[in-house]
Design a protein with these regions (language model features):
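His/Asp/Glu-enriched, well-ordered alpha-helical/loop segment
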Residues: 251-258, 300-386
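Divalent metal-coordination and catalytic microenvironments
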Residues: 19, 33, 38, 63, ...
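A conserved active-site cap/scaffold subdomain adjacent to cofactor or substrate pockets
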Residues: 269-270, 276-312
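Alpha-helical scaffold segments that flank or form the walls of functional sites
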Residues: 83-152, 175-188, 437-448
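Metal-coordinating catalytic core of metallo-dependent amide/deamination hydrolases
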Residues: 138-265, 270-272
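Active-site gating loops and adjacent loop-to-helix segments of metal-dependent hydrolytic enzymes
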Residues: 81-112, 151, 158, 163-173, ...
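Active-site microenvironment of metallo-dependent hydrolases
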Residues: 1-31, 35-41, 52, 352-466
Length: 466
């Protein structure tokens, strides 16, 4: 395996001949791919590729699947320092934990948090992550540097709240100028793709919601916001505006194909129709529903209606295989069992919405998400020589049900090997872990975090459980 790693780490062209390639139409044997200048320049039968590229020495990987990297349709890279503080907490943890924590981070801690989260993304097979924006003041550049240093492709949201929810609230005209500057700065970056965000509709004025959505649409980038996740937020919207959050966005004309709505779990049939009619997209975050949500998004119904959606972690757990398993499992538990639906979309649906479907909602359908000529060479080499994949009859289902991140041998973005068997090949990840362990406690202690429950040891001693 060390020989394979050495060959994959080179800077020249690669001709890879894996046992299987996961193409948009499904896994295929007897294929080969050529990676040149960071993109897939040829995907064809091994015979055709070797004939047309006689100068390249094929690298045989008979026990591996070459598949697209996962695309996390919704995450928060600057929340990794507090990720273990939210277990068992009631809804709207952003008010008590995330806003206070992120708002207290200085530039260095934003960098460390984002770098740690980006490393976790790559370890979990995510070659791309859609970040909803940091609430820290003026440190989005540190987040971008961290993601770039690790080699994670990222869609980075610039938060445009004008009524609250961040460390500092500039005037509306300043926010819009900063948003324009954000779009301009990263418009042609090879790994960083700009996006605009409003944390939740209630922390922005109607004028800002409409302006930011329109700006994103005109620029061809994604506008992100969280909607219909918690019952209390839906009720606040009804009281303040007379409409549910998605209904209010539709009323303002702020929905559209540029819009990516995180969660959309408490959603009515009318709101589903609004999403379908406007072409708006959803980040389906199944693990977030399990850990801290009020409901499960009706993803199968969205698929049947033609509503675009991709799978997101919401910063919960960076493992693309376990995310797919949770996505299918929650649809089965929440909807399939009651209707006798034994397929619940099938393995192919969840593979698609974790890769190309997620790239689509992220605004990156022409950039990544598939093994296809002209797209960025963002891919995984998954070891199929494992008990979990033996015997193999239906690889797409098997990846959803039996896949795990420890089966990923190599992670590539832009044609460059970033991780080998879970660890970076060109920087010291363990030094990062030591630095985070040394400084995270101080950062947490400084933040005005409010937890409702004590940590597990205190729970045990107080008699909450035996």
């Amino acid at each position: 395996m060390s020989v394979i790693r050495e060959k994959l780490s080179g800077t020249g062209d690669l001709l890879l001949r894996p046992g299987h390639v996961l193409l948009p139409e499904g896994p295929r044997a007897g294929m080969a791919v050529v990676v040149r200048a960071g993109v897939f320049c040829r995907v064809d039968t091994a015979e055709a590729v070797e004939r047309d590229y006689p100068d390249l020495l094929p690298l045989d990987l008979p026990d591996h699947l070459l598949m697209p990297g996962f695309v996390d349709a919704h995450t928060h890279l600057t929340q990794s320092l507090g990720k273990a503080l939210v277990f068992g907490e009631p809804s709207e943890i952003f008010r008590r934990i995330w806003v206070p924590l992120e708002g207290s981070l200085d530039e260095r801690m934003v960098y460390l948090s984002a770098k740690l989260a980006a490393l976790e993304c790559l370890r979990g097979g995510f070659t791309t992550a859609v970040d909803a924006g940091t609430r820290s003041e003026g440190h989005i550049g540190a987040l971008v540097r961290a993601a770039r240093d690790v080699g994670l492709r990222s869609v980075v949201g610039f938060i445009c709240n004008d009524l609250g929810g961040t460390a500092h609230i500039p005037d509306a005209d300043v926010i819009l100028r900063q948003a324009e500057a954000h779009l301009s700065t990263y418009r042609r970056d090879p790994l960083v793709h700009p996006s605009l965000a409003i944390s939740i509709p209630e922390v922005a004025s109607d004028g800002m919601l409409k302006a930011v959505s329109d700006m994103a649409g005109a620029a061809g980038v994604v506008f992100q916001t969280h909607v219909n996740e918690h019952l209390v937020a839906v009720e606040r919207s009804l009281v303040a505006r007379g409409r549910r959050p998605i209904e209010h966005l539709a009323h303002l004309g702020a929905l559209g194909p540029q819009v990516l709505l995180a969660h959309s779990t408490l959603i009515t049939p009318h709101e589903l129709n609004l999403l379908r009619e406007t072409g708006s997209a959803v980040a389906y975050n199944p693990v977030a529903s399990l850990w801290k949500g009020n409901a499960v998004a009706p993803a199968l119904q969205m698929a049947a209606l033609g509503i675009r959606f991709g799978l997101g972690t919401d910063g919960t757990r960076a493992d693309g295989f376990r995310l797919m398993d949770a996505a299918e499992g929650l649809q089965r538990a929440g909807f399939g069992l009651a209707t006798g639906d034994s397929s619940c979309g099938g393995g192919w649906l969840w593979l698609d919405r974790a890769t190309s479907g997620a790239a689509n909602v992220a605004g990156l359908a022409g950039v990544t998400g598939s093994i296809a000529e002209g797209l960025a060479a963002d891919f995984l080499l998954v070891d199929l020589d494992r008990p979990e994949f033996t015997p193999s009859y239906d690889l797409m289902w098997e990846l959803v049900r039996y896949g795990n991140r420890d089966q990923i041998d190599a992670v590539f973005t832009n044609g460059q090997l970033r991780l080998w068997q879970g660890w970076p090949v060109d920087w010291d990840a363990r030094a990062l872990l030591a630095e985070v362990r040394g400084d995270a406690a101080v950062a947490i202690a400084k933040a005005p975090i409010q937890r409702i429950h004590p940590l597990s040891e205190a729970h045990r001693h107080l008699g909450y459980y035996k």
